Amino acid sequence: MDGIRVLPLSCDDYYWPKWTPDSLYGYDTPAGIDAAALLAELEQLCRKNANSLRRYDMVSHRVWREPFQQDYDLIVLEGAFGPQALLGQPLLRSMVYLELALPLRLWRRQRRDRRERGHSLVYVIRQTVLETLPGERDFIRPLRQKADLVIQNSPSGLATLTQHARSLVAP
């Protein structure tokens, strides 16, 4: 991010292992995230005291630690179902809400889920309509009002995001 050393951290790596998906939302709910593990990891990273990062495999539901050694100025927590547990925590210095059009999200999701998870196109569409969209409505959209910055996926949005990131790491 233009001179800022960013450590990306994915909320998807904090799903509970062997968790039974919610009957209404499937995996598209904050209840699927081990918030205590996520918070503990963030605390270690903020103290620059971490030597491994948690990883989660969406197909096998296996959790493991991966060695980690990277200099960073900013931790970017990416994901839809981790921020809810961090609201009000001092570790969450800023929240950015990225808006993407539904067709683009569906296109990206079906590509990822078919390639990485072996799901069929019909399965991805069904999951999106029956689980993802209700989860988005109930858990993700409310974050928009709590965000410090709302951006569109556009060149001007990226410039605004970069400027915001610089303000967070400025001495």
At which residue positions do the language-model features occur?
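Acidic, metal/cofactor-coordinating or nucleic-acid-engaging core segments within structured domains
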Residues: 120-137
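ATP-dependent NMP and nucleoside kinases share a basic, alpha-helical "lid"
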Residues: 64-116
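A conserved segment at the C-terminal end of the G1
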Residues: 1-5
